[in-house]
Structure formats: C-alpha cells, structure tokens
Regions:
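Zn2+-dependent peptidoglycan hydrolase active-site motif and core
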Residues: 244-245, 257-304
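Terminal connector regions
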Residues: 132-178
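Acidic, glycine-rich catalytic/binding loops that coordinate metals and/or anionic ligands
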Residues: 173-192, 200-204, 212, 235, ...
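Asparagine-centered strand-capping/turn motif at beta-strand->loop junctions
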Residues: 72-79, 89
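Short, solvent-exposed loop/turn segments enriched in Ser/Thr/Gly
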Residues: 51-52, 62-69
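A structural signal for short beta-strand/turn segments enriched in small hydrophobics and glycine
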Residues: 256-258, 313-325
C-alpha cells in the first residue's frame, strides 16, 4: 500500500471534531424477519448515534460532500450484521443507499480502517458517511433508515422486536465553508490523505476526547506530498532530502495571529518505523497554529526543525512563510499536514470544512497502480487530465494532484 511504501501518512496532529450526541435510536420500523412485531417503538439490538452534525464542503469533483460518521453499538448478546443504511432528505428523497456490499467498504472499527460490518456483542463500529449533493441543493437535515440482522440461532433472539429503525435525524451544520489560500505553492501536490473517501487515513481517525465523546479529528485535513513523474522521491527515498516536497515553503492561508509554535523535534528517517511518540503532543512534530478568524484555527504539522519563522503573538499576512516542509513527529515521509480546527489545541479541536480560493486540478493518483509499478500490465499511477481544471472555492479531495499556484 502507498500508505506504507509512499508515506504511511498516519494523521500527524490528531485534530478534533465535536460529537453531537443524538440520544435514542428513533422509532422502530417493520421488522424484517417474518412474524416480528411491527407497531410502535420496539426493542432493538443496536443503538445509533453520530460523531457530529453533517459538515458540508464543496469538492473538486463538482458536488458538495456532507461528512459525518454513524456510531452503531450492538447491545445484544450475539454478533449483529448491518445490512443497509439509507439517507433521506426532508422531502423524502433518498440521497444515499448503502447495501451490504457497500457497507463493507465504509464500516470500520473505531480506530483504523479495518472493515467491520459484523458488530461483536457489546461492540461499536463506525460507518463513514459521505453524502453528495449538487452545490445548489439546500438541505436542513438528514434522516436515516437502518436495517440489520442476527443469526437465526442467536441466544435470546426473541428479545429483538425490530430489525429496521429510523434515526438519527441530524441537522446539517449551517456554518459556511471557510475560503482560504493554499498553504503551499507549485504543482504536483498530492492529497495523500484527505476528504472524503473511507479508505483515507484522515477520514478514519476517531479519538475519544475528555471521556465524553468520540472526536473526528481530521475529516478535512490534508497530507500534502509532492510528486515528480508520479513518484514522491528520487532513489530509494531513504533521506528526507530525497523527497520532492522536502524544504518547500509553508505559507499562511489567511491573515491571522500565531497562537502556538512547537519546535525542536528531529527529522524522522523516511520509510522506517516512527520513533519518539511518547505523548499526544509528539504527533505533530514541529508545528504552527494560527487563529485566522474567531474560533477558526489553521494547523500546520511536521515542519523542519529550526525552520519556523514566526513566534506566538505575531501577526501574519496571507502568503507569509511560516516554515519549511519536513518529516518530524508522526511522519514516515516528508509532507505537510494541514487543516482547520475550532480550538487552538489540535488534539481536541473540531475539524472544520474549508476550500482553496484558486487552484488547478492536474489529475488523480492510483494507489493500487503505484503498488503494482513492477507489473508491466499495470496502469500508470498518475493520471493527468488532458486539460487541467481550474478550481475556485473547492476542497482538494483525497488523491487529487494539484497545482496550488
């Protein structure tokens, strides 16, 4: 996998996303097995909640993405299997339908991307929800219809009164997308992790916060790695200097105030086991946090030691150099981890949607093709567009390759 051979860019600064608690599971619907009770509220084997109200962002693919996770807890004495999830608009239109096969690709253990459509007794899984709608489609809320099954010989199966439930109903977060300048310049910048695919490392990060909620720390964060001729480094990539993005200038995405600076972490050795991760603060390595609006903070991680040019309390302007792209902290290959959060502490802040004012979509990257580079029949890993697509006010999505100007 590219995440191991290319960068293994496991999220660096575990940013945070607020959990909106939605008590209860709503109203039980017709049970799927013959003879099951159908009227009124019924007992169920599962309880469903959400990590956050759906957050909306315009993507480079021409549609808006609404992002959140459903948390499904099995309160039953035997394994439960999810069989379908439907998402509907207030007018009843079905916006997304996930059957059993589709659920297998988006249902995961709470931390990590391991598929987990079967929920063990007293266990919880997360379903990565990526609902897409046209840019001009107004949505106030999303509703969910969920079905599941248990084995016919499961113990105390008779306790289950319904195998289909409604809920939760989630209001769409009304906050507008923050429009910013890109944090880097030049072409060949790959979003090696980012929104909105379930297989993206960032999309799968879930870390409990304050013993009270499961945070979505990196929904919209991007790990930027630079490509040349479809590769991130020259030679064997054993030195940070071999990587094409190493040393790139990291820029302020808006006018703002420096609220946090961390320096002194050494460079990691690329493509080798990461060392020195003793506490949460170590993950970001050398980093900078800017406040760019009330309650909106820009987080930059993995910068080169000694390269940071700003200090806490300093006012910065859009495009100002903050430091140089490095390989410090939780990083197995030089890259910039960037995202917006709603708290100056990247460990607890909620991930916020953002978009770049002007950039160009050059193409897309294929992880499987990269891993099969030795196969003469494998397609090229990097597919460039015949005509690059100018983008205004959109988010660079997972595996997009961008010219950031």
């Amino acid at each position: 996998m590219l995440q191991h051979r290319l960068l293994s860019l496991v999220a660096a600064c575990l940013l945070g996303s607020a959990i909106a608690t939605h008590p209860g599971v709503g109203r039980a619907q017709d049970a799927t097995p013959a003879g099951s009770p159908t009227a009124g509220e019924r007992s169920t084997a599962i309880v469903v909640s959400a990590t956050n109200d759906p957050l909306r962002v315009p993507g480079s693919d021409g549609v808006d993405h609404l992002e959140y996770d459903l948390l499904v807890t099995n309160a039953f004495a035997a394994p439960v299997t999810l069989t379908s999830i439907a998402v509907t608009a207030p007018d009843g239109e079905t916006l997304l339908h996930l059957d059993a096969d589709a659920l297998a690709g988006v249902t995961q253990h709470l931390l990590g991307r391991t598929p987990a459509t079967e929920i063990p007794a007293s266990g919880t899984v997360a379903v990565v929800m990526d609902v897409t709608v046209p840019h001009d489609r107004a949505l106030a809320s999303l509703s969910h219809q969920i079905t599941y099954e248990v084995a016919p010989d499961a113990p105390v199966r008779s306790l289950i009164g319904a195998y289909a439930i409604d809920g939760p109903q989630l209001p769409v977060d009304p906050r507008p997308t923050t429009i910013i300048a890109p944090p880097l310049r030049g072409d060949g910048w790959l979003a090696n992790s980012g929104c909105c695919a379930a297989e993206s490392i960032h999309r799968a990060i879930r870390v409990p916060v304050a013993g009270a909620r499961i945070g979505k720390q990196e929904i919209f964060a991007i790990d930027f790695a630079r490509l040349r001729d479809g590769k991130p480094f020259s030679g064997d990539g054993a030195r940070p200097e071999d990587w094409f993005g190493f040393g790139a200038e990291v820029l302020a995405v808006a006018d703002g105030t420096v609220v946090a600076v961390t320096d002194g972490y050494p460079e990691q050795t690329p493509l080798q086991p990461i060392t020195g991760m003793a506490k949460p603060e170590d993950f970001g390595g050398n980093s900078v946090v800017l406040e760019i609006a009330p309650g909106v903070y820009a987080d930059y991680a993995h910068l080169q030691p000694g390269s940071i040019t700003v200090a806490v309390g300093e006012q910065v302007t859009t495009g100002q150099v903050l430091g140089l792209l490095g390989n410090t902290g939780n990083s197995s290959g030089p890259h910039l981890h960037f995202g917006l959060i709603d708290d100056p502490d990247p460990m607890v802040g909620n991930s916020l949607p953002y978009a770049f004012d002007h950039w160009t979509l050059q193409g897309t990257f294929d992880l499987d093709a990269y891993d099969a580079a030795g196969d003469p029949d494998a397609p090229p890993a990097l597919t460039l567009k015949e005509t690059p697509e100018p983008q205004d006010g959109t988010l660079q999505l997972y595996l997009d390759v961008a010219d950031l100007g």
